[in-house]
Amino acid sequence: MEVANGSSAAQGQNGSSEGSNGYKLKFCTVCASNNNRSMEAHLRLSQADYPVISFGTGSLVRLPGPTITQPNVYHFNKTSYDSMFKELESKDARLYKNNGILNMLNRNRGVKWGPERWQDWQVGVPRLQHAKDRGSEGTEGGLVDIVITCEERCWDAVVDDLMNRGSPLNRPVHVINVEIKDNHEEAAVGGQGILDLANSLNAAAREERDAVGASAFDNGSASSRATFDERVPDILASWQERWPNLPATWTVAWF
């Protein structure tokens, strides 16, 4: 059967194949406004019991308005998804229901409180105030293993920001861009693809963790994860064959 974008190949891959005791990599998903693409992926990964956090790289949160020149603008870290939902519902419920914004915000407010900005993230600082977020279990320490962005400019922003931070923790992190168009339909497909990639990466990480020992692997040092790091390009290449319409870019950066 022909698969146009990998969706058939990935159906049923919800993380359960790893088993309840399977090792789980920690993920971070990133888009521009932490509303559509990164939140779809955040939800998908959390439903598969992956530890996951999410961010946006924009200066402000921008959502479509009545015209292209009249976006709805909000501040990161200060505005909840619930307040956005209620404001837009009161402004024009019919418009924002028909364009999918209310449905998106309703989903988001069931995942976490509100959009967070990548550049404001204090890596390694405990995220105890996010205990109610979906996917929060395992991310309490403020560290992740894999960052997945959903647009090239977001990937650039993340990589540049990490370089500017100067690697204070000397801890490697894989930064992968999965190019996803910013609409609800493509975000849904992209979320499936990201979950498929997470499953493949996690399977390899579990094997390498078993080989080097849990304590050493979980320490996160470059030496203890070298064999896993070496496998990532091949894993990504195999995944790209399954998802040809989601172009990917990859690099190793440092926290």
Swiss-Prot record:
EC number: 3.1.3.16
Alphabetized Gene3D superfamilies for the sequence: 3.40.50.2300
GO biological process: mRNA processing
Listed InterPro entries: RNA_pol_II_suA
Domain of life: Eukaryota
Catalytic reaction(s) noted: O-phospho-L-seryl-[protein] + H2O = L-seryl-[protein] + phosphate; O-phospho-L-threonyl-[protein] + H2O = L-threonyl-[protein] + phosphate
Pfam family, one: Ssu72
Molecular function per GO: protein serine/threonine phosphatase activity
Keyword Hydrolase: yes
Keywords carried by this UniProt record: Hydrolase, mRNA processing, Nucleus, Protein phosphatase
Location of this chain's protein in the cell: Nucleus
Chief site of localization: nucleus
One Gene Ontology CC term in the entry: nucleus
Keyword Hydrolase (UniProt): yes
Subunit structure: Component of the cleavage and polyadenylation factor (CPF) complex.
Function: Component of the cleavage and polyadenylation factor (CPF) complex, which plays a key role in polyadenylation-dependent pre-mRNA 3'-end formation and cooperates with cleavage factors including the CFIA complex and NAB4/CFIB. SSU72 is required for 3'-end formation of snoRNAs.
Record-stated family: Belongs to the SSU72 phosphatase family.
Protein name listed in UniProt: RNA polymerase II subunit A C-terminal domain phosphatase SSU72
Gene that specifies this protein: SSU72
